[in-house]
Regions:
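Electrostatic cytochrome c docking/interface patches
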Residues: 383-408
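C-terminal capping alpha-helices of c-type cytochrome domains
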Residues: 458-479
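Short, conserved, GDST-rich strand-edge loop motifs in beta-rich repeat architectures
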Residues: 51-70, 205-250, 338-360
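Conserved small/polar residues in nucleotide/adenosyl-binding loops
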Residues: 1-4
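Conserved blade-ending motifs and adjacent loop-strand segments that build the rim/top face
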Residues: 95-97, 104-105, 147-151, 180, ...
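Repeat-blade elements of multi-bladed beta-propeller folds
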Residues: 25-27, 31-61, 75, 100-125, ...
């Protein structure tokens, strides 16, 4: 745009070690706040609206030991479209420490609020609260939760700040949080019906366990590790959930499409899907809501009641929103079918959707699908994949090797190949061929397949580490 937002990182020659309560921190400690998705521009006020990301590392004790709000992380910001000067901002998550981005799509609407016509922007960021803000002044008008939240009890409309739940302070103990790291609403678009004044949101309920990094808790030191996710928390707790000291059970993972009233916080209706990772919706003037889902179905609902009116199996997982357009008086609806994104991290390892994920059941294919009333073309039915896990090699590994491999896998491999060795659109390593097993060290350590995108870890891990992670994968595959 006319003005770029830049963040200088001047730490290339700096040892990446940070000490608690130290006044000197390498600048890498203050990363975060990046933009992920589309910007919203509105000419009436000549403003550009952006949503910013979370802090990194997640643990604010490491990133900002003195505390504070950490402006402008997880914020909605209005910029002058000509100069780039900030006109106003609203921070959704002060003291951000949960990976709660505010980068989700920003929607513009006209609403009557408390008897006054207001020009507003609306957002459902990851933290679970739905924000209605005067887009000219930045005044917070509503902040109702659209999913269950336990990290904060509510948002105080007077101060604009969330009221934190003291029982969910992960600085003191391991706790499970709602929303988790995936958020209540992710990258997938939401849509709006201007007649009903209702927003349709593809929500997720995925709790995450947060705990301060063990080494930091004991020593006050945090060392950045290349090649992994440096959250400052025990990231491997995502796949090995400990017993919670408060005795609470973690709720099941679910995904829904909800019809949400942005002013009252009421959910008018909801559709529960077979899994959590589904597509963004499209609302039409014909009182329809279209949505694709992770089970491979593209469906249309009555916008007022949520009644399912039409469904078509595409045999492809869908996460994109559809679009509609007219050509020569004929209305079309098109959608890019294909799966991916952060859902790779969970695969089908959690929840009750095993065998229902289209990209696992049939494979992952990117296709542009277009529909119209009276269309005659058929979608090719895909055969189910053979998901029989092959015979595994004998590695003569000890329990110590396997446990060490579990930690290595969680920190270096799970982000692509799936937590607990349950992959999705990137290779599920339980299905490695005999040849791949034989070349495991050559691939993972030496980088034999680097041209295909699988970089070697010889600069980070040892050959013993590679044996340990291989042992863990084989152990999981033989259970």
């Amino acid at each position: 745009y006319k003005r770029q937002l830049l963040r200088d990182v001047l730490c290339q020659e700096t040892p990446i070690i940070f000490k608690r309560n130290s006044t000197m921190y390498a600048s890498i400690a203050f990363l975060g706040g990046c933009l992920f998705v589309l910007l919203s521009n509105f000419t009436e006020f000549n403003q550009l609206y952006i949503g910013t990301g979370n802090g990194s590392p997640w643990n604010q004790q490491i990133r900002s030991p003195g505390g504070g709000d950490n402006l402008f992380l997880s914020s909605i910001v209005a910029l002058d479209a000509d100069t780039g000067k900030m006109n106003w901002y609203y921070q959704t998550t002060p003291e951000e420490r949960w990976d709660y981005t505010a980068t989700q799509d920003i929607m513009l609407a006209d609403l009557k609020i408390d008897g006054t016509d207001r020009k507003v922007l609306m957002q459902a960021p990851k933290n679970g609260f739905f924000y209605v803000i005067d887009r000219k002044t930045g005044e917070l008008l509503r902040a109702n939760n659209y999913v269950r939240t336990n990290w904060a009890t509510h948002v105080d409309l007077e101060t604009g700040r969330p009221v934190l739940n003291p029982d969910k302070n992960y600085y003191e103990k391991a706790v499970w949080m709602l929303p988790g790291t995936f958020g209540g609403h992710g990258w997938q678009a939401m849509s709006y019906d201007p007649k009903q004044k209702i927003v349709f949101i593809p929500i997720m309920e995925i709790a995450a366990v947060h705990k301060v990094k063990e080494t930091f808790a004991k020593t006050g030191l945090f060392k950045m590790q290349p090649g992994t996710v440096n959250t400052g928390t025990e990231f491997n707790l995502f796949q090995t959930v400990p017993d919670m000291s408060d005795g609470e059970s973690i709720p099941p993972i679910t995904g829904e499409l909800i019809a949400f009233d942005p002013l009252t916080g009421e959910t008018k209706w909801s559709i529960k899907h077979e899994q959590f990772w589904n597509g963004g919706p499209l609302t039409t003037a014909g009182n329809l809501v279209f949505q694709g889902n992770g089970s491979g179905f593209f469906e249309a609902y009555n916008a007022e009641t949520g009644e399912l009116l039409w469904s078509r199996n595409t045999w492809i997982g869908i996460m994109a929103p559809p679009v509609t357009y007219m050509i020569d008086g004929q209305q079309y609806i098109s959608i890019l079918a294909g799966d991916g994104g952060a859902s790779n991290f969970l695969g089908d390892n959690f929840g009750e959707w095993e065998g229902k994920v289209a990209s696992i059941k049939y494979g992952n294919y990117g296709k542009l699908l277009t529909f119209k009333l009276g269309g005659k073309s058929k979608i090719e039915e895909l055969p189910e994949r053979d998901l029989t896990i092959p015979q595994q090699p004998i590695l003569n590994a000890s329990l110590e090797n396997i446990n060490a491999g579990m930690d290595i896998y969680a920190n270096y491999c799970a982000i692509c190949h799936g937590s607990g060795v349950h992959g999705k659109t990137i290779s599920d390593l339980r299905y490695m061929s005999e040849s791949t097993h034989e070349n495991f060290k050559n691939i993972v350590f030496d980088g034999m397949l680097e041209e295909n995108g699988m970089k070697g870890f010889s600069d980070i891990l040892t050959e013993e580490n590679i044996f340990e992670v291989h042992s863990y994968i084989v152990d999981v595959a033989t259970r």
